[in-house]
Amino acid sequence: MKEQTTDRTNGGTSNAFTIPGTEVRMMSSRNENRTYHIFISKPSTPPPPAGYPVIYLLDANSVFGTMTEAVRIQGRRPEKTGVIPAVIVGIGYETAEPFSSARHRDFTMPTAQSKLPERPDGREWPEHGGAEGFFRFIEEDLKPEIERDYQIDKKRQTIFGHSLGGLFVLQVLLTKPDAFQTYIAGSPSIHWNKPFILKKTDHFVSLTKKNNQPINILLAAGELEQHHKSRMNDNARELYERLAVLSEQGIRAEFCEFSGEGHISVLPVLVSRALRFALHPDGPHLSMG
């Protein structure tokens, strides 16, 4: 992040706040003609022999700072916090707002307009259905660049998404499970196209029963989200129950409901839980409390 200096009326100067060890770069998708702001945080400590764990973070404009500072603080004492240092790669957009409407395009599967849930404000949904192209950007453009510039442990890759981002995480898990080893889906918008998710879940369960595949999955929601007509919590819990039966095949799944938290307020506590889930010194851990 570039530091900026501004003159003050009292003769002093004001410097823009910068998180140590971070940078922002622009990247274009070769196949989709789209441009993203990539927020990167690198640990101050040398990489372990296998390389740094990495977390690919969706909606970086809203939560990159939260996750980066949490890793910086907790990663100093892994033996106490259960969090080791990691590279954080946030995927964001050219906007000063926490969220961009482009997330609807990038995080969702193709769905007929008549099958979409009603939008809270009554308007039509923005462009949507581009999840496959977004996944190709991550796999074909972003990951190779990150692995070129940083020492990455390819056996400890996590993807984190919330809301529609959580929906995208589930799509990747159920259709491209080899892409990551740990999947964090917070308040996932399963209601966007629940039949699609359930169909893909059945297929995933069937394949996994035949081929053991160690994967770590954290599903979570805020307690207060249960009152929304989307049934966010029930849907996430139902998916967890379908996946939990695969424990003998190497699937380690957990569902967390955070007391007193809503759809947005859940983010900081979800980040903290996700870090202990994905970055424990001994590998991803369940029920970290």
Swiss-Prot record:
Q: This protein is called what? A: Ferri-bacillibactin esterase BesA
Q: What induces it?
A: Repressed by fur in the presence of iron.
Q: Which organism is it from?
A: Bacillus subtilis (strain 168)
Keywords noted in UniProt: Cytoplasm, Hydrolase, Serine esterase
Q: Which family does it belong to?
A: Belongs to the esterase D family.
Q: Give the superkingdom in one word.
A: Bacteria
Q: What SUPFAM superfamilies does the entry give? A: alpha/beta-Hydrolases
Give GO terms: molecular function aspect only.
carboxylic ester hydrolase activity
Its principal location? cytoplasm
